Structure formats: structure tokens, C-alpha cells
């Protein structure tokens, strides 16, 4: 069997019983693909039921933790997709304000859309990202 070239990341600080990895990392020079980050605490409970901003902020925090565990940072993000349970543009704008603020001074392209339902009961926000994978360490110069 060929050597596996993808690392699946499950950060210790996030809900550990999730049935999926929070991010995957390709070899150096590759990409990090996050799972959809959710507004779920380490206990597996949705944070801020009914509160779009609280859920967006928790989701972003979880996304950044997953990216960090994969060796990436907000400045490495190439694109995000933001899902919001709504049919209201006002709600989309509210969530977008939290996302834009969290990524400043970076401004990665994003898709923002309203959806009918997400995976957890009372979940209103989910965000996924694609980021640059960490570069390999430079070898020490020869003496």
C-alpha cells in the first residue's frame, strides 16, 4: 500500500466525538481543507442557540483552531464558504460582519449562502475553508 500523503487533523480542544476530522493537510506546498466548522463547544453542545453572532463567533474560533492544528493561520486561507440557516439577507449580513471582522486584515474570497438546515439541532452557522498548507522547514545551512 502506498504511503498516505494526507494528514487528518482532530484538535484536542474541539469536540472529540465528532465522526469526522476537522481538517486535512496535503503535503508541503499543498492545501488544507477544513470540515465545516460548527458552533459546538468541547462538550458537543451547540453554543448560542438562536444567536447568529454568537454562533458565527464560536464557529470562527473553532475553524481557526482546526486550521492552527493543521499548521495554517487565518492569513493562509484562500477561500471560505459560509452557510447560514436563513432566507433573510439581513441574517446573512449579520453573520458576514462577524466573519469579515475575524479575518481582518485579510480578505479571502468567500461564498455566503442561506440554507434550510444544518447538521446539529439549533445550529445556524457553518463555515468551511481552504488554506495553504504549511511550508516545509528549511534545512539548516551546511557549515
Each model region followed by its residue ranges:
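N-terminal presequence-like segments and the immediate start of the first folded domain
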Residues: 1-61, 65-70, 75-78, 85-143
